[in-house]
Amino acid sequence: MALRLILGFDYGTKQIGVAVGQAITGQARELCTLKAQNGVPDWNQVEALIKEWKPDAVVVGLPLNMDGSPSDMCVRAEKFARRLNGRFNVPFYTHDERLTTFEAKGERLARGGQKGSYRDNPVDAIAAALLLQGWLDENAGLLNT
């Protein structure tokens, strides 16, 4: 199955960043940030995104430790990925998201600065775009089959 459109998720316990990527261009861009309560999103909002974008797959970021070992959040992120698959029957992939939030904050500053706190003006969607871009770059061969 050719993957044409992919949604990327930067999973968090309070917010989940969402990005969209196109195989034809090999580019990802930020889409939105969903609120979560203790890691549980509003599944109706997730369903609306799935129905609107009709992704061929989803990519969920894995927050690995700097040494490459799984962090405590990895278990929750993988569970979120499995739930996306179970609820919406969409294939999922995971991708190392180390330093994407740090890089997203730097990108936000480069775009003209941060207005207020990161809680009020989150960078999660930027981080989702960065992790999805990394996945697209690493899986270009898979996308064009």
UniProtKB/Swiss-Prot annotation:
GO biological process assignments: rRNA 5'-end processing
Main location: cytoplasm
Taxonomic superkingdom: Bacteria
Enzyme kind, highest EC tier: hydrolase
An example Gene Ontology CC term for this record: cytosol
A Pfam short name: RuvX
GO function term, MF aspect, one: nuclease activity
Presence of the UniProt keyword GTP-binding in the record: no
Residue ranges of coiled coil: none
UniProt subcellular location: Cytoplasm
The EC number(s) this enzyme carries: 3.1.-.-
Keyword list, A-Z: Cytoplasm, Hydrolase, Nuclease, Ribosome biogenesis
Record-stated family: Belongs to the YqgF nuclease family.
Annotated function: Could be a nuclease involved in processing of the 5'-end of pre-16S rRNA.
NCBIfam families for this protein: RNAse_H_YqgF
PANTHER family: POLYNUCLEOTIDYL TRANSFERASE, RIBONUCLEASE H-LIKE SUPERFAMILY PROTEIN
Name the record gives this protein: Putative pre-16S rRNA nuclease
Protein source organism: Pseudomonas fluorescens (strain ATCC BAA-477 / NRRL B-23932 / Pf-5)
